[in-house]
Amino acid sequence: GGETSGEGKGMWFGPRL
């Protein structure tokens, strides 16, 4: 959950949060 899709919980969250 960060800026790009990667985690799965957010639409634009990935390698940051």
UniProtKB/Swiss-Prot annotation:
The family annotation for this protein states: Belongs to the pyrokinin family.
Q: Name a biological process GO annotation.
A: neuropeptide signaling pathway
Q: Which PROSITE patterns match?
A: PYROKININ
Instruction: Output the InterPro entries linked to this UniProt entry.
Output: Pyrokinin_CS
Per the record's keyword annotation, is Secreted included, yes or no? yes
Known role: Myoactive.
Single GO molecular function = neuropeptide hormone activity
Ranges in coiled-coil conformation: none
Could you tell me in which tissues this protein is expressed? Answer: Expressed in abdominal perisympathetic organs and abdominal ganglia.
What this protein is called in its record is Pyrokinin-5a
**What does the UniProt keyword field contain?**
Amidation, Neuropeptide, Secreted
The Leucine amide modification is found at L17
One term under GO cellular component: extracellular region
Q: Does the keyword Secreted apply?
A: yes
State its location(s). Secreted
